[in-house]
């Protein structure tokens, strides 16, 4: 679950929907 949260944070940091892609 932490990986999903990290992905969401990375997506927001990059300004992209990285969490959606991942």
From Swiss-Prot:
GO terms for cellular component: mitochondrion. GO terms for molecular function: ATP binding. Keywords: ATP-binding, Mitochondrion, Nucleotide-binding, Stress response. Its main location: mitochondrion. Disulfide bonds: none annotated. InterPro entries: Heat_shock_70_CS. It is found in: Mitochondrion. Belongs to the heat shock protein 70 family. This is Heat shock 70-related protein 1, mitochondrial.
